[in-house]
Curated annotation (Swiss-Prot):
Species for this entry: Agrobacterium fabrum (strain C58 / ATCC 33970)
Description of how the protein assembles with itself and partners: Homodimer.
Gene giving rise to this polypeptide: truA
Gene3D superfamilies in the cross-refs: Pseudouridine synthase I, catalytic domain, C-terminal subdomain (3.30.70.660), Pseudouridine synthase I, catalytic domain, N-terminal subdomain (3.30.70.580)
Protein task: Formation of pseudouridine at positions 38, 39 and 40 in the anticodon stem and loop of transfer RNAs.
Enzyme nomenclature, EC number: 5.4.99.12
Protein name: tRNA pseudouridine synthase A
Gene Ontology molecular function, alphabetical: RNA binding; tRNA pseudouridine(38-40) synthase activity
Classification via InterPro entries: PsdUridine_synth_cat_dom_sf, PsdUridine_synth_TruA, PsdUridine_synth_TruA_a/b_dom, PsdUridine_synth_TruA_C, TruA/RsuA/RluB/E/F_N
Pfam families: PseudoU_synth_1 (PF01416)
Binding site for substrate: 113
Residues of the active site: 52
Family label: Belongs to the tRNA pseudouridine synthase TruA family.
């Protein structure tokens, strides 16, 4: 069956997360419904990351197998039309034909996330549900120093949800940087994979560091404790964005049969 890779953007606010839900809207469910409306096929779409309820994405990647071949741009445009008609806060930014050995989840080399904090006295209006509003100022340089205690290969038991289903709490964190531009503090995290609630746990702990409630040494001690109780509060989902997925430099596009290179009559 022809396989397609898609880059997907979504506002996570109205959804119960990426993964299909029985009792609530999901991003995966919205995309699968759009495919069903377009093609009549019931398909399963696999994403590179299973974002939680309220988490946004500007560069989620997914793959899908369809019974017929498509020009990728036509598939993108058609899916966007059906998503718009359904009132979904989801958009397909790009589509590409790929070989069957491409897997959006398991072919990924690195995943990039961004967490946004806005520090100001007034509540958020335009950025409501787009960032974590903190009414007191934070020391972003102290936050960055504390963040470096977490970079590298560690047992991240302290920073994962008690409901995390990963077999091992050991992960390699390639990057955890904290920068500031005016009222906006950005936390950028990169790794091949993350544990459930790991980045939001980082953000909550780094906020404490920015307030002066934890030193960089305290953050290192929390990591080494391997105890969830040593973690700071889990930051709200509003500020978290799935930014990008890196794949091997060369993923050969799937060659389409010559007979299917012609434009569709309809």
């Amino acid at each position: 069956m022809p396989r397609f890779r898609m880059t997907v953007e979504y506002d996570g606010t109205p959804y119960y997360g990426w993964q299909r839900q029985e009792n609530g809207p999901s991003v995966q469910g919205a995309l699968e419904a759009a495919v069903r409306s377009l093609t009549g096929e019931s398909v399963s779409i696999r994403g590179a990351g299973r974002t939680d309820s309220g988490v946004h994405a500007v560069g989620q990647v997914a793959h899908i197998d369809l019974s017929r071949d498509w020009e990728p741009y036509k598939l993108r445009n058609a899916l966007n039309a059906h998503l718009a008609m359904a009132g979904e806060a989801v958009a397909v930014l790009d589509a590409a034909a790929v070989t069957e050995d491409f897997d959006a989840r398991f072919s990924a080399l690195r995943r990039h996330y961004l967490y946004r904090i806005i520090c100001r006295k007034s509540r958020l209006a335009l950025e409501h549900k787009r960032a974590w509003w903190v009414s007191k100022d934070l020391d972003h340089e102290r936050m960055h120093e504390a963040a470096q205690m977490l970079v590298g290969r560690h047992d991240f038991t302290t920073f994962r949800s008690v409901h995390c289903q990963a077999n091992s709490p050991v992960r390699t964190l390639d990057r955890l940087d904290v920068t500031r531009n005016g009222d906006l503090i950005e936390i950028r995290a990169t790794a091949q994979s993350f544990l459930h609630n790991q980045i939001r746990s980082f953000a909550g702990t780094l906020k404490l560091a920015g307030e002066g409630g934890m030193t960089p040494d305290d953050v290192r001690a929390a990591l080494e404790a391997r105890d969830r109780k040593a973690c700071g509060p889990v930051a709200p989902p509003d500020g978290l964005y799935f930014m990008q997925v890196d794949y091997p430099d060369v993923i050969p596009p799937r060659r389409r049969p010559e007979i299917e290179m012609t434009e569709d009559a309809d």
